[in-house]
Amino acid sequence: GYMPALENLNCLGTLEAVNGILRLEYLTGLAEPFAIPSTLTTLNGLAISNMPGVTELDLRGTGIKDIEINNSTSSDRFKLSADDVVEGSLTLNGLFELTGMKEVKGDVTISMPNTTETVDLLSNTEAVRGNFTLTYNATTGGINLPVLASVGGACTLKVKAPVAAPKLKTV
């Protein structure tokens, strides 16, 4: 039979809690405005991958701990807003414009597509309490971590491009 493309998350109905990760992948029919249903008051993690109709997401005030977004198939920057303190981990793949996230209590893992431009990563993030990993990046542009001052765990940079972290004091 034929199943139409999902265009919104109304199918979640009155779902109130996801104790694990809500994983949304290959939902090509979803488009803006994209929002977490207001009935969903407990959400430990959100993973979004391969959803070309979704280019921005505001997670402020949702209480989501772990955030994972794969935007690697788009050359546009994904606009992600989250609380100033992210209680869990942050995993990003692609180019992003970030708001909030001054402190991430868990790990941060970032993968980037190839680009020749210089990219500011984590433009607001001052502290990563867990491990910080910048992985697979063959870009010829530079990578800036403009305000990152401390990493609580291991700091792993698997990149070819020059990395600047002018305020980094503690690893």
What residue spans do the PLM features occupy?
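Concave beta-strand-loop units of leucine-rich repeat
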Residues: 1-31, 35-55, 59-82, 86-100, ...
